[in-house]
């Protein structure tokens, strides 16, 4: 019964792992709901400031802030939002594939690349893959603060403002629903015009700007970029927990199937051992 004992030991080990993955699935469900609440709470601000920026830009068509000016691209920057922890399926890998594909397209045009990496997994990936990481931050926790991001984002904004970076992208995972997380690459700078926005007619906008719209535009553009990065971090957190929940559920289900298969093998081995013992007893009795 040596084989049966080994199988029994494997079954016990897998059951122990199954309990862990099942517990992690339940924890991920709870954290995902909290992350969804944070995402929903921050979204109205991000959308509203986008509208305000659009209206300010429309109110001053002759004024072009440096963040809104197109120029020849010699160096691009990426703000990459990854996770701090693993065990979330292919969430990070799928994101890195989208990023590397875009980086390669720029490299083929002899354009240099700078990276600002948010999340430990991104930092670890680019340490082995290679890349000019000019800013990095990790260990943001379950409730990230926009104040934690300002320093790293400022490095990239200063680079664009001073002409070291000619285009800036934000790379993160969008939370579509519990089953779907989509890696996306959006251009942050220069600020592209919102083609879907309708022109504002006089009397339809309920704000008065003091001292004037131009000065507000200068101040709000930085806040706008920071809010977009923060929204991406919060949304990426919800996507992470959803992906982890799915990964742990799949692991738990696979463990159950493996236990069933091993249980069948164990029963067959035990049956074969009992049959052999009976045959030996019958053979011994016949010899006597």
Swiss-Prot record:
InterPro entries registered for this protein in UniProt: ATP_synth_F1_ATPase_gsu, ATP_synth_F1_gsu, ATP_synth_F1_gsu_CS
User: What job does the chain carry out?
Assistant: Produces ATP from ADP in the presence of a proton gradient across the membrane. The gamma chain is believed to be important in regulating ATPase activity and the flow of protons through the CF(0) complex.
Organism (species): Stutzerimonas stutzeri (strain A1501)
Q: How does it sit in the membrane?
A: Peripheral membrane protein
Keyword Membrane carried by entry: yes
Q: What are the alphabetically sorted keywords of the record?
A: ATP synthesis, Cell inner membrane, Cell membrane, CF(1), Hydrogen ion transport, Ion transport, Membrane, Transport
**GO cellular component terms, semicolon-separated:** plasma membrane; proton-transporting ATP synthase complex
Q: What is the lineage of its organism?
A: Bacteria, Pseudomonadati, Pseudomonadota, Gammaproteobacteria, Pseudomonadales
Subunit-structure text: F-type ATPases have 2 components, CF(1) - the catalytic core - and CF(0) - the membrane proton channel. CF(1) has five subunits: alpha(3), beta(3), gamma(1), delta(1), epsilon(1). CF(0) has three main subunits: a, b and c.
Primary location: membrane
> Where found in the cell?
Cell inner membrane
User: What protein name does the entry list?
Assistant: ATP synthase gamma chain
Q: Which GO terms describe its molecular function?
A: ATP binding; proton-transporting ATP synthase activity, rotational mechanism
Q: Which family does it belong to?
A: Belongs to the ATPase gamma chain family.
**Single GO BP term:** proton motive force-driven plasma membrane ATP synthesis
- Record PROSITE patterns: ATPASE_GAMMA (PS00153)
């Amino acid at each position: 019964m040596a084989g049966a004992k080994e199988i029994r030991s494997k079954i016990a080990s897998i059951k122990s792992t199954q309990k862990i993955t099942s517990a992690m699935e339940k924890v991920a469900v709870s954290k995902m709901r909290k992350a969804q609440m944070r995402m929903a709470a921050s979204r109205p601000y991000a959308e509203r400031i986008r509208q305000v920026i659009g209206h300010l830009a429309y109110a001053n068509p002759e004024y072009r802030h440096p963040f809104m000016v197109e120029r020849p691209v010699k160096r691009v920057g990426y703000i990459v939002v990854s996770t701090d922890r693993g065990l979330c399926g292919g969430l990070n890998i799928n994101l890195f594939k989208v990023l590397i594909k875009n980086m390669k397209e720029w490299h083929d045009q002899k354009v240099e690349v700078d990276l600002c990496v948010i999340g430990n997994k991104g930092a670890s990936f680019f340490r082995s893959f290679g890349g000019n990481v000019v800013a990095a931050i990790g260990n943001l926790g379950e409730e990230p603060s926009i104040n934690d991001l300002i320093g790293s984002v400022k490095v990239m904004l200063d680079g664009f403002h001073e002409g070291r970076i000619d285009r800036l992208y934000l790379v993160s995972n969008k939370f579509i629903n519990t089953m779907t997380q989509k890696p996306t690459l959006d251009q942050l700078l220069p600020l592209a015009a919102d083609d879907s926005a309708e022109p504002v007619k006089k009397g339809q906008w309920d704000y008065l700007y003091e001292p004037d719209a131009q000065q507000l535009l200068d101040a709000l553009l930085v806040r706008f970029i920071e809010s977009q990065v923060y929204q991406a971090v919060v949304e990426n957190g919800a996507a992470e927990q959803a992906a982890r929940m799915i990964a742990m559920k799949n692991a738990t289900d696979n463990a159950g199937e493996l236990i069933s298969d091993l249980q069948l093998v164990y029963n067959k081995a035990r049956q074969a051992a009992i049959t052999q013992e009976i045959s030996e007893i019958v053979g011994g009795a016949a010899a006597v």
